[in-house]
Amino acid sequence: MGYKKIKFGDDARKSLAIGVNILADAVKTTLGPKGRNVILDKSFNSPLVTKDGVSVAKEIELKDKFENMGAQMVKEVASKTSDVAGDGTTTATVLAQTIVNEGIKAVISGINPMDLKRGIDKTIYQAVLELKKISIPCVDTLSISQVGTISANGETIIGKIISDAMNRVGKNGVITVDEGRGFEDELEVVEGMQFDRGYISPYFISNQENMSSILENCLILITDKKISNVRDIVNILELISKKNKSLFIIAEDIEGEALATLVINNIRGVLKILAVKAPGFGDRRKEILKDISILTGSTLISEELGIKLENIDLSLLGFAKKITSTKENTIILGGGGDENSIKKRINTIKKQISESLSDYDKEKLQERMAKLAGGVAVIRVGSATEIEMKEKKARIEDALHSTRAAVEEGVVIGGGVSLIRILNKLKNLQGDNEDQNYGIQIALKALEAPLRQIVKNSGGEPSIVLNNIKSSSNNFGYDASTGKYGDMFKMGIIDPVKVTRSALQSAGSIGGLLITTEAMIADYSDEKSV
């Protein structure tokens, strides 16, 4: 174990503050509709131009280990806010910077850091309660579009495309952002449930023009078993033939005489049949098969449940209005599943998402939930250059997160004005002692910081705008993109409550930790190896 370097008290806090300010100063230039660009050097690629606060924060590593600790702690504010709400990272960083700078000054002047932290925590808690009181539900298309536009730095096209996507696949539907091939942004929607498995044999093709197989008003057999023996399916084929229905089969695999029998029946026109392999692998495959079973109203035929394939009857089969299968994909439309059962399944998956610690698992669970909820929308990003595409893609992803947050918890007036309205309601807040009151004043001062920075980035005078807004009431605010005052809702300047709330809570949490730091320990750096 190598030697360690240790700093104590004010010396430690000053190093923390330097790191916090270096990171925050780089990040906060991106805040607001007139936020500036930051260029990030990429070792093996062209430089990345971005206005995304969390992207800027992630790039920053400082040489001095003590200063770097401060930078990394504020980076945690940005990341935590991004994880919870998907946006608001720059706002959180600006709030944290003010809390840390003012808090460290107070501690150096002799104020008790623990009471200071209690005062800050009390203010943040009350501010969150006040935010929730003034929130307005975000359910209509216009509000959704406005939230997306604000988060995308004022691009109305992005706001509209996100709003259209939500209209098409629903509020819980999966919306993904991919790189497009043209200059224009495009929205592509896959209705119903789609999975990445196509027909087992080309002999099932019914439409030669686009090489696809289509079944309408068909019965559905789903099993997690491999079908190779014709005896397993003879009984059910006879029952379906008598009913003059078509059959769609999903199985682990179909081979040998069983596959030959299905192909011959299909070619001769005795029975319209389509067979595909089950999607996914391992445990995920079983869960996907259960999803499809619930969506189509069928029973998953599994020997684990004591059901043998050769003994099944029509009551265990599901139904769909239309199934289309190509070489690579299959889409199920109009599944005959019970709505309550589908809702229960969606709620179960939602719970699994909230409990999952893996980003990959969360993504796969969200895909499954979307397919049950009604479809998947893909926003394809268009641009002239790869650098522009990457920057635009990051902004659309931010806007999408903001929009989801708005639908979840509602909206408040944006541009930092909602925090000023809260400020007026908290001016009489009192702590248990004078040191706590000082903490309350620090947190109240921090509430002004986002508005000040937005105005500064737009070239305005922060103190004048702040005083004008403080002396007004309700929805009156400042549009930094035009330099005009007016009703923020009418001007379409709104923020999701979840984003503002998460920014406040993350900033208060990390700010309090940094203020109460008394010692810092780091490895000795080998200057020769640098």
UniProtKB/Swiss-Prot annotation:
Gene Ontology MF, one: isomerase activity
Question: Which UniProt key words apply to this protein?
Answer: ATP-binding, Chaperone, Cytoplasm, Isomerase, Nucleotide-binding
> Where in the cell is the protein located?
Cytoplasm
The UniProt entry, under InterPro entries, shows: Chaperonin_Cpn60_CS, Cpn60/GroEL, Cpn60/GroEL/TCP-1, GroEL-like_apical_dom_sf, GROEL-like_equatorial_sf, TCP-1-like_intermed_sf
Q: Where does ATP bind?
A: T30, L31, G32, P33, K51, D87, G88, T89, T90, T91, G415, D495
Has UniProt tagged this entry with the keyword Chaperone? yes
The transmembrane residues are: none
Which GO terms are recorded in the biological process aspect for this UniProt protein?
Answer: protein refolding
The answer to whether UniProt assigns keyword Methyltransferase to this entry is no
Q: What is its main location?
A: cytoplasm
Gene3D superfamilies named in the record: GroEL, GroEL-like equatorial domain, TCP-1-like chaperonin intermediate domain
Q: What reactions does this protein catalyze?
A: ATP + H2O + a folded polypeptide = ADP + phosphate + an unfolded polypeptide
Q: What is its EC number?
A: 5.6.1.7
Q: What PROSITE patterns does UniProt report for this protein, alphabetically?
A: CHAPERONINS_CPN60
User: What Pfam families would the database entry show?
Assistant: Cpn60_TCP1 (PF00118)
What Gene Ontology cellular component terms go with this record? cytoplasm
Q: Member of which family?
A: Belongs to the chaperonin (HSP60) family.
Subunit structure and binding partners: Forms a cylinder of 14 subunits composed of two heptameric rings stacked back-to-back. Interacts with the co-chaperonin GroES.
Q: What is this protein called?
A: Chaperonin GroEL
Query: Which species is this record about?
Result: Carsonella ruddii (strain PV)
